[in-house]
Design a protein with these regions (language model features):
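Structural motif
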Residues: 20-29, 116-122, 340-352
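N-terminal short leaders/motifs
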Residues: 35, 40-43, 75-83, 229-238
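Active-site-proximal, Lys/Arg-enriched surface segment
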Residues: 35, 63-148, 259-261
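Single, function-defining residue in the core of a domain
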Residues: 1-17, 39, 88, 101, ...
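Alpha-helix boundary/capping residues
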Residues: 52-55, 66, 79, 305-308, ...
C-alpha cells in the first residue's frame, strides 16, 4: 500500500505557525503556494486568478505587502532540522542570479552579468543568500533582493552585495545564527569591501576563491634580531609553482592539496590558503581557495566551498531550458522566477522570493519522504503531482454533490474551462 506523501502545503503550513504572520496572510500564502505549483503557464496575477478563487486584484494587493522572507525560510530550515532531514550546521552561500527581462518600464532594468551567456546582458539581477547543509548539500534560499540599477554616489555593487548579506545575517533567528560555519562566495566576492564587512560586522569567517596570481606573502617565523625598528613580518612572496614551503596533505581524489597561512595584500589580513592541484598530461590545473579563519582545516575549506555549488539548484529548479535557435540561450520557469509582469518594486521582490520559496517547499517535502535515501528531486514531477491532485479534487467535489442534470452540466462546463483564457 502506497504511503501518503508529505505535500509542500503541509511543509509551509507548519512553518507559518511559527513565523509570526497574521492568520489572513498565512491563509493567502498557503493558497498561493498551491496555485504556484499547479499553474502550467506563466506565473502572473491574471493566470493565478484563472485557477484560484481570488481575483487578480487581490493577488496584486497581497504582493504589495511585506513578508519576512528570511524569518519564514529560516523556520523551514529549523523545521527540517527538527525532522532530522537537515543537519544542525550550515553555511550561507551568496550569489547573484541573472533574470531575463525585456521592456523599458521595469524597475532597475540594466546590464548584468549572465553566467549562461558569458557576457553582460540587459535584464534584472537578484542577490540570493542561501542556507546550505554542507553534509547533504541541500539548499534553502533565505531571501533574494533585486540589485538596483543606480546606486548612491561612492557606492559600488560590491557594497550593495555586502549590505544584503549583513541584513540577512542580522535577521537570522539566534538558533540558526549559531549554526553558521561561514559565508561562502565565488571569486567575485573576494574583495576587501565585501570580505572586511562580513568578517568585521557579520562576525563570521568568509570562504572563497582566489585568482592564480593572487598577491600573497609568507609570514616570517624566524627569530627576532633585537635591532631597533619594526620587526620583520613577511618572508617573501607565495609561489603557486613551488610548494616546498607549503604543507602537503593526503587526499583521496586524483589531486594534490597544499595549505599555508599567508598574508593577503588585497584583503589586508592573514588567511588560510589551500591549493588544489590536478595533474594533467601537459599542464596541471590549480584551484586556490581560502578562509579568513586561519585555524580552519584545509579539508573543511574545500568541503564548504564545494557545498556552495548546490545553491544553483533552486535557480535551476525555478527555471526550465528553453531552446532558442538550437542552443540553450534563455530559460523559462518551472516556478516563474522571471515571469513577473508587475512594474512595482514591492511586487517584483514578492514574486522572486515566492518563486524560490515554492521550490524550497517542494524540495523539503520530497526530502521528508526520501530521508532514508539520497534525494532524487524533480521540480517538473512536483508540479505534475500538484496539478493532478488539484484537478482530482475538483472532480471529486462535483461527484460528492447531489445535482440535477442541469447543475451537473454547469459544473462540468466549469471544470472543463479551468484555466482557459478568455476569447
Amino acid at each position: 500500500m502506497r504511503t501518503q506523501r508529505t505535500t509542500p502545503d503541509q511543509i509551509l503550513a507548519a512553518a507559518l505557525e511559527h513565523a509570526g504572520l497574521r492568520r489572513t496572510q498565512q491563509t493567502y500564502l498557503r493558497l498561493l503556494l498551491t496555485l504556484w505549483l499547479v499553474l502550467p503557464g506563466r506565473h502572473n496575477f491574471t493566470n493565478l486568478a484563472r485557477y484560484g478563487p481570488t481575483s487578480d486584484r487581490t493577488h496584486r494587493s497581497w504582493a504589495q505587502k511585506p513578508v519576512p522572507w528570511v524569518q519564514l525560510n529560516s523556520t523551514l530550515v529549523l523545521q527540517a532540522q527538527d525532522q532530522q532531514t537537515l543537519h544542525r550546521s550550515g553555511i550561507l552561500g551568496v550569489d547573484a542570479v541573472f533574470i531575463p527581462k525585456y521592456g523599458s518600464h521595469t524597475p532597475d532594468l540594466a546590464s548584468y552579468w549572465s553566467g549562461c551567456q558569458g557576457r553582460s546582458v540587459r535584464g534584472l539581477e537578484g542577490t540570493c543568500i542561501t542556507w546550505i547543509d554542507p553534509t547533504t548539500h541541500q539548499p534553502v534560499p533565505l531571501s533574494i533582493t533585486q540589485t538596483p540599477a543606480e546606486l548612491p554616489a561612492g557606492q559600488s555593487r560590491v557594497d550593495f552585495y555586502a549590505t544584503v548579506t549583513l541584513n540577512t545575517i542580522t535577521q537570522l533567528p539566534e538558533q540558526l545564527r549559531k549554526q553558521v560555519q561561514a559565508v561562502v562566495g565565488d571569486a567575485y566576492y573576494t574583495k576587501l569591501k565585501f570580505v572586511a564587512r562580513v568578517v568585521n560586522e557579520g562576525q563570521l569567517p568568509f570562504v572563497g576563491k582566489m585568482r592564480k596570481d593572487a598577491n600573497l606573502k609568507h609570514l616570517f617565523t624566524g627569530p627576532r634580531t633585537g635591532k631597533p625598528g619594526r620587526p620583520r613580518l613577511y618572508d617573501g612572496k607565495v609561489s603557486l609553482q613551488d610548494y616546498s614551503r607549503w604543507d602537503a596533505l593526503p587526499w583521496a581524489d586524483e589531486c594534490m592539496v597544499y595549505t599555508v597561512v599567508a598574508y593577503s595584500v588585497s584583503l589586508k589580513r592573514q588567511v588560510r590558503v589551500v591549493a588544489v592541484v590536478w595533474p594533467g598530461s601537459r599542464s596541471s590545473r590549480t584551484e586556490v581557495l581560502f578562509s579568513t579563519s586561519t585555524t580552519m582545516m584545509a579539508a573543511t575549506i574545500i568541503a564548504l566551498y564545494r557545498a556552495r555549488f548546490s545553491m544553483e539548484f533552486p535557480f535551476r529548479d525555478g527555471k526550465r531550458p528553453s531552446v532558442l535557435m538550437g542552443a540553450v540561450l534563455a530559460k523559462k520557469q518551472f516556478a516563474g522566477l522571471s515571469e513577473c509582469q508587475s512594474r512595482q518594486v514591492e511586487a517584483l521582490h514578492f514574486h522572486l522570493n515566492m518563486a524560490l520559496m515554492a521550490v524550497s517547499a517542494a524540495r523539503l517535502s520530497q526530502l521528508h519522504d526520501q530521508r532514508a535515501s539520497p534525494l532524487v528531486f524533480s521540480m517538473e514531477d512536483e508540479k505534475r503531482r500538484a496539478y493532478n491532485e488539484f484537478f482530482a479534487e475538483r472532480i471529486l467535489s462535483i461527484l460528492t454533490v447531489e445535482q440535477t442534470d442541469q447543475k451537473r452540466e454547469d459544473l462540468l462546463a466549469d471544470l472543463l474551462s479551468l484555466g482557459v483564457k478568455a476569447a
